[in-house]
């Protein structure tokens, strides 16, 4: 199935890591990942910028290289860019698709939805690449889904760190902070979700 997605530019040499602090606004207990090998491990990859090189905590796919991460927000959010630190040995994701304000996406229906934006990713072990979003598309967000369909050749995908840069508005819309955010919700392994539904990409 064809997706209405476009690649976006990315910037090298992110010089203000402190900006990538929307993570502190996240309720990581509500973040979920589909097809993660260890249940709940995705909650530990939304680290502080200072801890981005921590290799003890990561999320790894289980049945194949695909991961779906669902991130609900507690307030209206604008996302400006995304940083991804993946694993070595070909386990870093090489593609990312984003879907906004749809909390019902899983492997059984993801091909039924057009993604909001798609990026071709590079192997980045330092967090030096920020993938910019389309400004007109990533406003008024209350839920973000990130889909990683493939990697650089490993049987499984590993992600050590995700940071979201943007603007977080308090629930009462009284305070605006430049920061990052993320949370998801869904099931664990693809075998529990599919029940025979095909999820081939085209």
Curated annotation (Swiss-Prot):
Pfam families: PITH. InterPro entries: Galactose-bd-like_sf, PITH1-like, PITH_dom, PITH_dom_sf. GO terms for cellular component: cytoplasm. Residues 11-184 form the PITH domain. Gene3D superfamilies: PITH domain. PROSITE patterns: PITH. Belongs to the PITHD1 family. PANTHER family: AD039 HT014 THIOREDOXIN FAMILY TRP26, PITH DOMAIN-CONTAINING PROTEIN 1. This is PITH domain-containing protein 1. It comes from Dictyostelium discoideum (Social amoeba).
